[in-house]
Design a protein with these regions (language model features):
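N-terminal zymogen propeptides
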Residues: 2-65, 109, 115-118, 125, ...
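Aspartic protease catalytic domain
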Residues: 2-34, 76-78, 86-91, 102, ...
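Charged, flexible boundary elements
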Residues: 48-75, 251-270
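Signature of the N-terminal lobe/flap region of pepsin-like aspartyl proteases
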Residues: 55, 64-178, 182-186, 191, ...
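Beta-strand-rich binding-surface signature
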Residues: 68-72, 81-85, 92, 144-146, ...
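Short beta-strand-centered segments at strand-helix junctions
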Residues: 94-96, 197-208, 291-293, 387-392
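Eukaryotic endomembrane system proteins
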Residues: 158-168, 174-247, 253-262, 280-283
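Membrane-interfacial loop- and helix-cap regions that link adjacent transmembrane helices
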Residues: 272, 309, 313-318
Length: 428
């Protein structure tokens, strides 16, 4: 999903069009990369099993006011930089592409010039992006795609393979050939941001992580650390954290399209809201957190009740987010207001055990440009999420969030996200 207030709930429909024939509102932003360089003599099977075999990417951006996080990937020969919106809620990575481009949005770099290495229609990566029974190969020599996002944006294109440039944390260079989308017809959504494309980090076979894992180059583990001060880092691999210090919960076996811990119970100030069975997903493609209409109304009622008699008054003139409050003077940081707000928590049930994911005020509030405090939790039902509940970037800040696809676990640990990791000891 991607980015801002509505992460990408991705609808993938492959149209099998001929490659040559294919002739913003910040309040509701969309929820929306030869194997080794000549300098390396190590084999992939050795690298994946030793320390330093993770790949780390610096992250740029913030929840507010930028409204999204992005990373830089280097693609092609010679390698060229592209800024991509990182999205754990969708699978396919794509770049705006000169194929030629029918419709492309303004971007920070020149359009990607695709290689001549087309992904054929019967390739497993192409098949993975079709619903069962809907994979029809009208043109068997290529894999055409159309992806649509909940903010109304879309990308139409064709899958190609090209060389990506990565570095392991031990310094070894890595140049795998991976599939990506060459998007030659883009329709911007309501949350359009000037980027070169989307970095799909979901659980599907087409994701960059899955492709690297299938080539035995990294563990099937992804994580990110988003700083509340802006920036952070993204990583592939499992040697940057001490697993014994991480809080873990199981991935749902009933909801396999996204990184979901299953259903949750909502707590406010240590007390149950009475709302249970809230189907929840983690999604870096959403700047903000979403609750279904019933949970959202219950939460806002509890917050308003808690603020009764206090010096905060609702700021109806501040349209930064759906609900804002003002004080006697403008606020400069969450520290100025956190005494008025209680900790929220989602309790995930795994068999007989329960795991709490706590949200301190820093994890669900922002200070607007007007100096008011605004609730960074929104009504997901109103923006098309129906009953789905979504943990967005605001609620994942200043902690390492880990998605271990090998063990089917989701984990988190408080962390300093301002520094790129060199070893797991930095999180002790």
């Amino acid at each position: 999903m991607r980015k801002g207030e509505v992460g990408f709930v991705l609808v993938v429909v492959f149209l099998l069009l001929g490659f040559s024939s294919a002739s913003t509102d910040d309040k509701y932003q969309r929820w929306r990369k030869s194997m080794f360089s000549p300098y390396s003599t190590a084999t992939s099977s050795l690298l994946i099993n030793r320390a330093g075999s993770s790949i780390v990417f610096p992250i740029h951006g913030n929840v507010y006011p930028t409204g999204y996080y992005n990373v830089t990937l280097f693609v092609g020969q010679p390698a060229k930089p592209y800024f991509l919106d990182l999205d754990t809620g969708s699978d396919l990575t794509w770049l705006q592409c000169d194929a030629p481009c029918v419709q492309c949005t303004p971007a920070p770099h020149p359009l990607y010039r695709p290689s001549n290495d087309l992904v054929i229609c019967k390739d497993p990566i192409c098949e993975s992006l079709h619903a069962p029974g809907e994979h029809k190969c009208e043109n068997p020599e290529q894999c055409d795609y159309e992806v649509g996002y909940a903010d109304g944006g879309s990308s139409l294109g064709v899958l190609v393979k090209d060389v990506f440039a990565f570095n392991y944390t031990n310094g070894v260079r890595l140049n795998p050939r991976l599939a990506l989308g060459c998007g030659y017809d883009q329709l911007p959504g309501t949350s359009y941001h000037p980027l070169d494309g989307i970095l799909g980090l979901g659980r599907g076979k087409s994701s960059i992580l899955s492709q690297l894992h299938d080539q035995n180059l990294v563990r099937n583990v992804i994580g990110h650390c988003l700083s509340g001060r802006g920036g952070g880092f993204l990583f592939f691999g499992d040697d940057l954290y001490d697993s014994s210090r991480v809080v873990w919960t199981s991935m749902s076996s009933d909801y396999t399209k996204h990184y979901s811990p299953g259903v949750a119970e909502l707590f406010f100030g240590g007390k149950s809201s009475g709302l249970k069975n809230l189907l929840t997903i983690f999604d870096s493609g959403s700047s903000y957190t979403y609750l279904n209409s019933q949970a959202y109304q219950a939460l806002t009622s509890m917050i308003k009740k808690e603020l009764t008699g206090k010096s905060l008054k609702e700021a109806v003139d501040d349209q930064t987010l759906s609900l804002c409050w003002k004080g006697r003077r403008p606020f400069k940081s969450i520290r100025d207001v956190k005494k008025y707000f209680k900790t929220l928590a989602l309790s995930f049930i795994n068999g007989r055990t329960k795991t709490l994911y706590e949200l301190t005020p820093e994890a669900y509030l922002i200070i607007s440009s007007k100096g008011n405090v605004c609730l960074g939790i929104l009504n997901g039902t109103e923006v098309g999420l129906q009953d789905l509940n979504l943990i967005g970037d605001i609620s994942m800040q200043d902690r390492m969030v880990i998605f271990d696809n090998d063990k089917q676990m989701i984990g988190w640990i408080q962390a300093n996200c301002d520094r790129l990791p060199k070893s797991r000891t930095m999180y002790m």
